[in-house]
């Protein structure tokens, strides 16, 4: 058990990299906040107001889809979900995006996932929340907020699984970037998130028509003037209060970035700003550097069952970093910041603050 826990903590050293406090980027006047991180380590590469708490709109669904994929563990075949009264009628009067789910409808899990992702279906998000929330939407929202805490995020609170704006429903660009980074580790999520082709949902027990879901992000459509080839997957969001929000995974020459923008006043502002940010980041960060182990060690107390189970020794295993051009491994220092104690519940319940990188 001790060896397992030590290995678990050591793995987190590679995955949970804290931000570089000095990461600044282009000053945008048309978008309130943004954050760009390295998708592999979580290192912040550029930001503006990244911790400001804002209304997320439908990029909320990244967490919803991530938790649904976590529960499914890639096993979608034969799994059907039954649409409840609340899934449909809790959205009455909200002018929500939806896929016309009906109470009592039996929906394949895969259809619910793609409908929520591509069509941004709020009824689909409700259905998924019930799936991973013990049968209720409220349980799903509680699971979403529990995952926020597990990731160590401090500027996010969810009040629903779809993103309809409310005073107690908010996130930040930094938090959303880390949520997407986590979601990309869940079985099947990246496949859903990056799908570009039209998705076909077959008729069900109560819905006789075939439904078609098409990609709406113009930055991913090759015939659009706003097309950005590097963007592999994205989620768009909009409400009158939130304005335009956006989160994407972009890849170029082996470098994988996550970019989040929030509160862009106009749709064209979002398009132009995302292009500016990705051009900046890909020009400045062109490759990874392997930083060898510094020989750092630390002890963590393991507790459980009302007492102390022992201690494990954690060793710095080295880390792979995305450094700006002109910055070398010699310019980086690494320090271990381990928790005082560890309760062995699950991988995702460790706070994401085990390694801090300082650029000097």
Q: What residue spans do the PLM features occupy?
A:
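Active-site-proximal flexible loops/turns
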Residues: 9, 45, 65-68, 244, ...
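Short secondary-structure junctions and interdomain/linker hinges
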Residues: 15, 120-123, 284-288
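Domain-terminus/edge residues, biased toward the C-terminal soluble/receptor-binding domains
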Residues: 153-154, 167-170, 174-360
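Sec-dependent N-terminal signal peptides of Gram-positive bacterial secreted proteins and lipoproteins
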Residues: 4-22
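Hydrophobic alpha-helical membrane context
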Residues: 14-15, 73, 277, 285
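Active-site-adjacent loops and short helices of periplasmic peptidoglycan-processing enzymes
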Residues: 21-174, 178-187
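A general lysine-centric signal
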Residues: 2-3, 61
């Amino acid at each position: 058990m001790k060896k397992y826990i030590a290995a678990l903590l050591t793995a987190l050293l590679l995955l949970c990299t804290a931000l570089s406090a000095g990461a600044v980027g282009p000053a945008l006047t048309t978008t309130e906040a943004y954050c760009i991180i390295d998708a592999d380590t979580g290192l912040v590469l550029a930001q503006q107001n990244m911790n400001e708490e804002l209304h997320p709109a439908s990029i909320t669904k990244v967490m919803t889809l991530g938790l649904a994929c976590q529960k499914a563990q890639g096993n979608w075949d034969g799994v059907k979900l039954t649409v409840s009264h609340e899934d449909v009628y809790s959205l009455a009067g909200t002018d929500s995006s939806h896929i016309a789910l009906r109470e009592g409808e039996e929906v394949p899990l895969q259809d619910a996932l793609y409908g929520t992702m591509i069509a941004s279906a709020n009824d689909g998000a409700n259905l998924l929340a019930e799936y991973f929330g013990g049968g209720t939407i409220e349980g799903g929202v509680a699971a979403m907020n529990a995952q926020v805490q597990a990731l160590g995020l401090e500027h996010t609170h969810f009040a629903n699984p779809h993103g309809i704006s409310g005073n107690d429903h908010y996130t930040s660009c930094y938090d959303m970037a880390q949520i997407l980074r986590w979601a990309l580790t869940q079985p099947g999520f990246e496949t859903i998130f990056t799908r570009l082709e039209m998705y076909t949902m077959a008729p069900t027990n109560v819905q006789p028509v075939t439904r078609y879901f098409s990609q709406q992000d113009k930055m991913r459509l090759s015939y659009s003037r706003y097309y950005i080839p590097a963007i592999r997957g994205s989620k768009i969001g909009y409400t009158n209060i939130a304005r335009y929000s956006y989160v994407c995974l972009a890849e170029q020459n082996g470098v994988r970035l996550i970019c989040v923008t929030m509160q862009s006043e106009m749709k064209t502002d979002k398009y132009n700003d995302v292009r500016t940010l990705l051009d900046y980041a890909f020009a400045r960060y062109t490759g990874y550097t392997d930083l060898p182990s510094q020989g750092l060690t630390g002890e963590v107390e393991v507790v459980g069952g009302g007492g102390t189970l022992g201690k494990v020794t954690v060793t710095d295993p080295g880390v792979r970093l995305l450094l700006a051009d002109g910055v070398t491994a010699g310019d980086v220092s690494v320090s271990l910041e381990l928790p005082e104690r560890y309760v062995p519940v699950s991988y995702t319940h460790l706070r994401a603050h085990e390694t801090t990188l300082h650029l000097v």
